[in-house]
Amino acid sequence: MIVKTNVKLNLGLSVLRKRADGFHDIETLFVPCYDFGDTLEIITGDDYSRTSAALFAKYDAPAGHFDASTSSATDKLSDWQEALVGGPVEPTELSESAKDEEKGAALPGNVAASYDGRLVQGISEDGKLMITIAREEGVDWNPLKDLCAKAYNILAQDFDLPPVKIFLEKEAPVGAGLGGGSADAAFTLKALNELCGLGLDDQRLSEYASKLGSDCAFFIFNRPMIGSGRGEVLEPYDINLSEYEIKVLIPEGVAVSTAEAYRGIVPREGLPSGRSDRLGEQKCLPEDPGASECHENRRIGGQPVNSTGMLMVGGHCQNKIGDPVEPTGMTDLKDVLAMPVAEWKDNLVNDFEATVFKAHPELAAIKQSLYDSCAVYASMSGSGSALFALYKK
């Protein structure tokens, strides 16, 4: 089975309070975005599909054949390793932390091997899972710790799953606040449910997904949803943005960790009401005096957006960040979303911008540049670094 995943955007993101369990309660509107996505293939049995073979060829790696049904995984590793990397590879300890094991998300690990840094493979200790991850920019994480592997494992705790091979080509940006990894996990759950005839409905799948990540459950439903709690409490929400074109921009060389984004953020519950937790005015000063005007070709910060919608930041914008304006207390997201889109600029806020923009002022410059290019609304998605803008068609 082959599926194409998608990512998400956040329309507004309020950090409400810190909970006793260390997580934060949030409120946001998740919206599917199909501009980016990964390619996921799951195969039961021993055959390699035409697609998986093409994946190995694309990354100039010889496809190794792994048969999990005839002997122990350890006995078969040497041939597989030699086929993959041209020689034996030392086994790597892949066990998760005790905290993850308590969550039931850990996958007993046996071996991970890498080919040229762009394609990695891992085999579970029991030999039932082989996972291959490929990415042009390189894969610097262990495949057996990937959320796709954890999705298989969490279902395997309750169901007798057959041996499978998972092939994942990462094409969506990593560390951009678009939820690409969470989407991979959710689509893995859905694919395994169908392939293995588990008969789980979306509600049950979302319960498994919520154990893997705060925004994983959204991708089970994959329609506009208001997320609360950690993001796993979902409520359908009807919104019509058909009058607007949405541009998603991925700044080059800027990745933001969620932990970094939360560092220094002040939850809204402890703030006075009626004010907003946003940075003050940001001004973009383009090299071209006319670049900040509205242009039909939508030059962003003096630079045209390329054909993929990506903005490569080249220093044309000089950012000037004023003092943060007074922070805001609790607001009702539905009330804000009901406003005309033209009023969202001053009311629909991503609270992470306050901390992330301080650490990465170039993102503030890009956001201002989006408004300079006639965007009706612009925001960072999730904890960044991706930004998006709505333009009137």
Task: Identify the role of each PLM range.
Residues 32-33, 210-211, 217-220, 237-242, ...:
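Solvent-exposed alpha-helices and their adjacent loops that cap or buttress functional pockets
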Residues 221, 226-377, 392:
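Conserved, helical-rich catalytic subdomain that frames metal- and/or nucleotide-binding sites
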Residues 185, 189-226, 233:
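Contiguous, small/hydrophobic- and glycine-enriched helical/loop subdomains that border
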Residues 1-176, 194-203, 239-241, 251-254:
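ATP-binding N-lobe of GHMP and related small-molecule kinases
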Residues 150-158, 204, 208-211, 355, ...:
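Generic non-transmembrane alpha-helical segments
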Residues 2, 39-41, 224-226, 246-248, ...:
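Conserved hydrophobic/aromatic beta-strand scaffold that supports enzyme active sites
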Residues 141, 167-196, 214, 377-391:
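Glycine/serine-rich anion-binding loops at beta->alpha junctions
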Residues 11, 40, 148, 181, ...:
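Residue-level signal for inorganic ion chemistry
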